[in-house]
């Protein structure tokens, strides 16, 4: 007989589970209060009895720490229960092991495990548990999962999916598929939020393989626009935190994201899944930190903006050269040249009677070649002085030691990173490929190679990071990946889409990243879930991706509207905004080619409640947003308006990239506007 066979039985069971959860939450509240009261009593006792003996203090200290630990555990339990009381579970499979006399077990799957200590049964299984993987990977029939004891084989006889909101079951679907299309369509048709949401209820089989991949030391995810790659990467982090709890925690992970707006947009996913937020940084922050924040530099955003507004052949040539594997090979040869030619040993008169010969000092420089060059001075000094002590039986003073170290350091001509970097271009006979901007400002493309040289000379591995997640992988150059590999010799998840590069002269494909990191398993996501079929089809005309498979969710055809002049175009955009405001949509993105165009549009529209997001913004907001295509990467909106799509504004390859990014932000409705006689040739 099937457990909870009818929908009526399922609704009744759901209410039982919610009542039990609320009962346990109530008990934990009492327990938390008891621990707080006990700690307050200890505090009062210690305050009132200042003369108690050390043994009693020690005993009380242990009791206080014990109450703290138990109290924190109870609070953590309450937090997890509170997360599932509104939506206890979203799926169910009935599974029977193949071995004899095993009953059919109903397995309800939710965001967290709920083990009822009273009945000693697991009522809800965490979506990350090994047994839960069958919900995503199998249809009805034979199935298996990997348990700590090995592979467990069996049969799935029933599969259900539920939509539960605020403790009420909206509907239930019998499903023979991995994730039923009706459920997926309903989720995809929903409106965009101000934060990215978890997708545990609709994870697809190919996405699940990426999330649960434990073997790959470096996993490179190439996913088409709207394939959910960022969300999948975050669910992968949540899975790894669950699977390896005890050996890795949230603070051991680092996310490299493109900007603070995007970092804020994705900040809700891990807490929704019951994990702590993960540290986040940007590529340029990390590179600048390696260089001890010594140099002013053009940001990546400023580089892209210059390429969009006033590109010059020389600037493009410098970027392309520094993004090539030939450049990396040349840098490596130059580092060997430094090793062999930059240390010029000299005799050092240590005392009136003792001189350290140049040959001996030179020998020690190469003896300690396991260290980065600048790290050798300390070891060389200690070794030389130890040898002097053996030979001359004397002990040097601190002043003599410091003098020797200073002299050894002076013999090395590579103590200034920037000078060494300039030397490289002279050595290559290409001095024109290095250019400092006004106020001694470095170009963005010089930041990574300068950091690469610094690490070769100084060292700088960051072993505190156990897993590195790099998003928008296509916008980073091979030399940047080389720096990341040297800085973070840990496991990595790298994700992006080669079709969405805003850095066409310095971008990387999955194969290039694999080559730069010397390792990496590439997994691909072809299905696009974000946009309607019509919007995806329109985007394909701008940049064809033969691998992309659109989900069959239909909607309005994108509109391209022509106007006689800018005034008419602006008036039409205001009407489109009014139509949006009267609709059920929650978010509208007005996406311009550049930040200056976006700022100008915001000024001209003069509509209340419009949010202009710049490269300096730090939070994503719901509602009407005016933003550049570069800043919009990774975000999504119910509706998108793209102004000024004339042939003068969108004509170069980088313009095509920006237009593709802008178009693929739209979920349900897309309108492009322009004034003049011709629209961009890309549409």
Residue ranges, per PLM feature:
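Conserved phosphate/pyrophosphate-binding and hydrolysis machinery centered on Walker-type P-loop NTPases
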Residues: 189, 193, 321, 370, ...
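P-loop NTPase Walker
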Residues: 1-36, 40, 184-303, 633, ...
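Domain-scale macromolecular recognition modules
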Residues: 85, 91-93, 99-104, 453, ...
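Alpha-helical nucleic-acid-binding subdomain
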Residues: 241-468, 475-483, 491
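Beta-sheet entry/capping signal
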Residues: 92, 209, 218, 252-254, ...
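Extended, charged low-complexity regulatory segments
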Residues: 1-200, 204, 208-212, 680
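Conserved helicase motor core of SF1/SF2 NTP-dependent helicases
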Residues: 246, 260-276, 281-286, 292-300, ...
